[in-house]
C-alpha cells in the first residue's frame, strides 16, 4: 500500500471512488480532479492538499482540510462533520445537501459556494465572505453568521432559527420564505432586501 499511497500523493492515481483511506496521511497531495466519490476519508489528513475540482461526495468526518485548495470541488451530500477548513481555499465549491453540522467556516472566502439544502446547524460562519453564495433551503439554525458578508446571497427557504447575524451584510440578498424565528439581526445591513419578519 505504501507505493500506492505515494502514487496517490503525486496525483498518479485519480480514480479512487469507493476507496478506504480512513486516517490516511495525504497532506500536500496533488488530487486535483480526483474522483473520491463514496470513499472513506474519515480522519484523513488532507492539510494543504490540492483538491481543485475533485469529486468528494464521501465520508470526510473528522478529516483535516486546513490549507487545502478546494476551489470548484464537489462535496454534495458528503459527511463533513468535525472537518477543519482553516485557511482553505473554498470558492465555487459545491456543498449541496452536505452535513456540515458545527463546521468552522469563519473568516473564509466562500463566494459563489453552493450550500443548497446543506445542514449547517450550529456552524461558525462569522466574518465569512459569502458573496453570491447559494444557501437556499439550507438549515442554519443556531449558526454564527456575525459579521458575515452575504451580499446578493440566495437564502430562499433557508432556516435561520436562532442564528446570529449581528453586523452581517445582507445587501440585496434573496430571502423569500426564509425562517427567521429568534434570529439576531442587530446592526445587520438589510438594504435592498424585502425583509418581512
Segment roles from a protein language model:
Residues 1-197:
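Tandem repeat scaffolds
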Amino acid at each position: 500500500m505504501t507505493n500506492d499511497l505515494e502514487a496517490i500523493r503525486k496525483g498518479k492515481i485519480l480514480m479512487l471512488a469507493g476507496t478506504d483511506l480512513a486516517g490516511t496521511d495525504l497532506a500536500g497531495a496533488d488530487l486535483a480532479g480526483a474522483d473520491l466519490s463514496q470513499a472513506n476519508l474519515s480522519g484523513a489528513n488532507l492539510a494543504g492538499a490540492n483538491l481543485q475540482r475533485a469529486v468528494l461526495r464521501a465520508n470526510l468526518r473528522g478529516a483535516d482540510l486546513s490549507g487545502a485548495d478546494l476551489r470548484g470541488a464537489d462535496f454534495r451530500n458528503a459527511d463533513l462533520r468535525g472537518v477543519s477548513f482553516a485557511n482553505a481555499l473554498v470558492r465555487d465549491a459545491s456543498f449541496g445537501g452536505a452535513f456540515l453540522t458545527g463546521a468552522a467556516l469563519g473568516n473564509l472566502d466562500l463566494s459563489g459556494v453552493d450550500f443548497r439544502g446543506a445542514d449547517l446547524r450550529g456552524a461558525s460562519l462569522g466574518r465569512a465572505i459569502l458573496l453570491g453564495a447559494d444557501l437556499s433551503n439550507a438549515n442554519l439554525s443556531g449558526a454564527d453568521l456575525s459579521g458575515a458578508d452575504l451580499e446578493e446571497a440566495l437564502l430562499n427557504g433557508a432556516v435561520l432559527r436562532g442564528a446570529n447575524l449581528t453586523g452581517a451584510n445582507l445587501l440585496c440578498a434573496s430571502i423569500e420564505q426564509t425562517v427567521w424565528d429568534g434570529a439576531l439581526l442587530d446592526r445587520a445591513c438589510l438594504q435592498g432586501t424585502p425583509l418581512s419578519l
